[in-house]
């Protein structure tokens, strides 16, 4: 009989199975519960604390309490962010954006979905030392833009100048043929490293990976003098040890080179540094075509055409910098720099045939041979003292000696009979000293007060030999005092400044001394618009003094018909400049639009007049000169962290009103840059049409140039191949003069600059820990030789 309680063995087995099933259900439930428990969310919105505008692409990073990375994201187009799949625990959330202070939020014992609401970030000028930026970023201020290069841009660059080309900044051009940084519209570019003004060859010496950011001053303050653009490279500061670098670019199919070597040694508070640059050029395909039209005093009209033949050009440029600095952080900085510049140009020769256009059989042979040598040693002493209550004092003294020697032989001959023989020799010595003192005070709410004194005094002794022996002794002095205040009212940033200037000049044996006092105010208004856009209005007044070469009371024979003559009666004049700038950023797109007007009454401009059977070229204070400028810069990228391009274009309209002439000239120009990177490879292409300049009666043409470069990087070594003007064989620069008595249209060619292949190599290494000297706030230099040049 079967019992009603069941079989004990069977009952025991079922009990065991049920227990196992219960355990698995409990474990599975715990896993599901744990999985849901781990899937926590953190969300919020980021705004600008000042104007409550949303902040796109702000960085949001979640870290553990010991700073280990957990998750990260960026805000979207509406300023929102979301972090999901977060485990329970305690965290720190950091929210940052370029130009703002980082906000830290403590999230202790996070166990549920959390909404942080609105997070406000306050303004700050940040330094991203040690942080990799995945996309080039920029923050704009009234006087400057702070730009952080991306990792992609740094990997595609072999030096600091290459990096500038990759960043595609508005109004900044990198001239690959002449290896220099330029500002569109003949502007003055000043370059610095950690606040210290340096030469452009030292920018080429920078290792891109050491560059934290570039402070692009497109509205420089009064303490920057006459600079139109200031580029300040902020680099990492070494602690101890040293570094060495080499940067070389050598033409393959012609003699064109740019080579730079540099090194630094650091010990405790001291730094020793040196750099040397050499730039050889040796061309045999240089020529000049020129068409001139003369209307002489006797009623004769002569239309003469110069048909150029290939000639020789040779140039060697040497730059040496030796530097010592001693710094006590937050106390003082002493910096001493010795600079030596030497440009040796033994040949800059033209030859060809001069033909009478009315009678092509009427020809003469022509040679125009020039040579020059220039050297300028300079000693720069700098002292900066940091005081209490955010105050700084700066003292700077620079002494420079400029020595210039030049020769020119111009001859016209027919059937080996010499018709015209011009032999000019110039020997010039110039001594100058520049002294400056600056005071700065940081106030509350980001306001700043600064003031300074500056004095520049020069003495020039020149000898001109051209059948006669002329000697000139000239003295020129310029003193100024300035004050500037920068403040902020809600969304409006403003800057008010004024400079009082005294300029004087005297020339021995000439009754043409002058002394002039001027007051030059300056105003800047900067307003942040909704979104990432802004508008800026700038208005300046400045005093312009004549150069010593223009003031020299001597004659220089140019050819059989023309003489160049200095004018000791020239006076300084004022320049009035107003600029309106609009800037817009949205995701990958950046737009910068500019409109400007400049007015110079009594401007010093060229003129020509008849004197007997000769035509005199000289300078005088004319009625006025005006220009209207409009330009637009569009930059897109990086796209997929691979491609970036920019397009610039604009119009220049010049109004030149002389005492006896009136001219109008309009120039349209454009420029395009494309950069692509893939892994260790980089490709870059640029094309630029002529930005032409017109003043007085002369149009000076810009460059019409193209360039393409392929590069490969391996650690600190980068090699590349560059081609200048790969698709053209007629590179030229044009100049025109519209004078009623002696007009010309001239084209200068250098055959080697077309399809010029250049091999490049950049290498940097360091040893030990690093340390860098402090930031030097000013640097002065005298680059005016003080002599009058001659020639066509």
Range-by-range predicted roles:
Residues 38, 61, 78-80, 101-103, ...:
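Membrane-proximal, glycine/serine-rich, low-complexity loop/turn segments characteristic
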Residues 285-301, 347-363, 405-416, 461-469, ...:
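Outer-membrane beta-barrel translocator domains and adjoining extracellular loop/strand segments
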Residues 432-434, 565-567, 571, 577, ...:
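Outer membrane beta-barrel strand-and-loop segments of large Gram-negative receptors
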């Amino acid at each position: 009989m079967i019992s009603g309680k069941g079989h004990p063995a069977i009952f025991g087995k079922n009990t065991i199975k049920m227990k196992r099933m219960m355990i698995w259900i409990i474990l599975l439930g715990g896993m599901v519960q744990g999985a849901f428990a781990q899937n926590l969310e953190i969300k919020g919105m980021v705004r600008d604390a000042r104007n409550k505008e949303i902040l796109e692409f702000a960085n949001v990073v979640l870290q553990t309490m010991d700073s280990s990375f957990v998750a990260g994201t960026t805000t979207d187009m509406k300023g929102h962010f979301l972090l999901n799949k977060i485990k329970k625990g305690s965290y720190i959330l950091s929210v940052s954006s370029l130009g703002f202070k980082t906000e830290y939020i403590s999230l202790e014992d996070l166990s549920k979905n959390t909404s942080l609401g609105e997070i406000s970030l306050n303004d700050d000028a940040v330094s991203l030392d040690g942080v990799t930026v995945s996309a080039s970023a920029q923050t704009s201020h009234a006087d400057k833009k702070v730009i952080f290069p991306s990792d992609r841009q740094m990997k595609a660059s072999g030096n600091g100048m290459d990096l500038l080309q990759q960043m595609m900044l508005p109004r900044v051009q990198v001239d690959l043929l002449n290896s220099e940084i330029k500002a569109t519209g003949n502007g003055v570019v000043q370059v610095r490293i950690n606040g210290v003004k340096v030469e452009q060859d030292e920018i080429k010496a920078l290792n891109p990976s050491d560059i934290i950011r570039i402070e692009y001053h497109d509205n420089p303050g009064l303490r920057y003098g006459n600079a139109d653009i200031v580029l300040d490279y902020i680099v990492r500061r070494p602690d101890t040890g040293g570094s060495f670098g080499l940067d070389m670019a050598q033409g393959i199919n012609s003699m064109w080179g740019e080579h730079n070597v540099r090194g630094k040694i650091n010990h405790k508070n001291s730094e020793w540094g040196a750099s040397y640059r050499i730039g050889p050029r040796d061309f045999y395909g240089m020529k000049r075509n020129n068409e001139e039209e003369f209307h002489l005093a006797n009623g004769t009209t002569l239309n003469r055409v110069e048909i150029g033949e290939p000639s020789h050009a040779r140039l060697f440029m040497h730059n040496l910098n030796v530097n010592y600095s001693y710094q006590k952080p937050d106390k003082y900085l002493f910096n001493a720099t010795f600079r030596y510049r030497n440009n040796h140009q033994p040949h800059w020769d033209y030859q060809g045939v001069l033909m009478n256009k009315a009678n092509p059989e009427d020809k003469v042979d022509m040679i125009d041979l020039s040579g020059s040598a220039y050297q300028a040693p300079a000693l720069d002493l700098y002292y900066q003292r940091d005081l209490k209550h955010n105050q700084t004092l700066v003292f700077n003294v620079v002494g420079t000696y400029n020595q210039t020697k030049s020769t020119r032989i111009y001859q016209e001959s027919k059937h080996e009979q010499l018709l015209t023989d011009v032999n000019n020799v110039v020997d010039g010595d110039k001594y100058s000293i520049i002294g400056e003192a600056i005071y700065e005070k940081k106030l509350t709410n980001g306001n700043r007060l600064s003031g300074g004194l500056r004095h520049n005094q020069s003495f020039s002794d020149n000898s001109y030999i051209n059948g006669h022996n002329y000697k000139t002794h000239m003295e020129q002095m310029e003193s100024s005092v300035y004050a500037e205040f920068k403040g902020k009212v809600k969304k409006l940033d403003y800057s008010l400044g004024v400079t009082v200037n005294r300029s004087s000049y005297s020339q021995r044996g000439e009754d043409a001394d002058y002394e002039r006092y001027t007051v030059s105010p300056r105003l800047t208004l900067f307003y942040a618009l909704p979104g990432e856009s802004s508008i800026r209005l700038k208005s300046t007044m400045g005093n312009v003094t004549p150069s010593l070469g223009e003031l020299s009371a001597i004659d220089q024979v140019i050819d059989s018909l023309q003489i160049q003559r200095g004018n000791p009666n020239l006076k300084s004049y004022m320049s009035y400049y107003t600029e309106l700038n609009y800037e817009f950023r949205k995701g990958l797109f950046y737009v910068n639009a500019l409109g400007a007007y400049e007015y110079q009454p009594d401007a010093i401009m060229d003129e020509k007049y008849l004197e007997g059977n000769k035509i005199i070229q000289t300078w005088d204070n004319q009625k006025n000169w005006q220009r209207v400028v409009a330009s637009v810069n569009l930059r897109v990228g990086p796209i997929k962290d691979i491609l970036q391009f920019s397009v610039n274009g604009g119009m220049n309209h010049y109004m030149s009103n002389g005492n006896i002439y009136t001219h109008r000239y309009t120039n349209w120009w454009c420029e395009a840059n494309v950069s692509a990177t893939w892994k260790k490879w980089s490709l870059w292409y640029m094309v630029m049409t002529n930005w032409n300049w017109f003043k007085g009666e002369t149009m000076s043409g810009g460059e019409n140039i193209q360039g393409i470069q392929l590069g490969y990087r391996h650690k600190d070594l980068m090699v590349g191949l560059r081609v200048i003007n790969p698709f053209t064989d007629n590179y030229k620069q044009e100049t025109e003069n519209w004078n009623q008595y002696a007009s010309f249209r001239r084209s200068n060619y250098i055959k080697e600059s077309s399809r010029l292949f250049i091999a490049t190599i950049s290498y940097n290494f360091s040893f030990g820990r690093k340390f860098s000297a402090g930031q030097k706030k000013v640097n002065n230099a005298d680059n005016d030789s003080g002599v009058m040049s001659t020639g066509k």
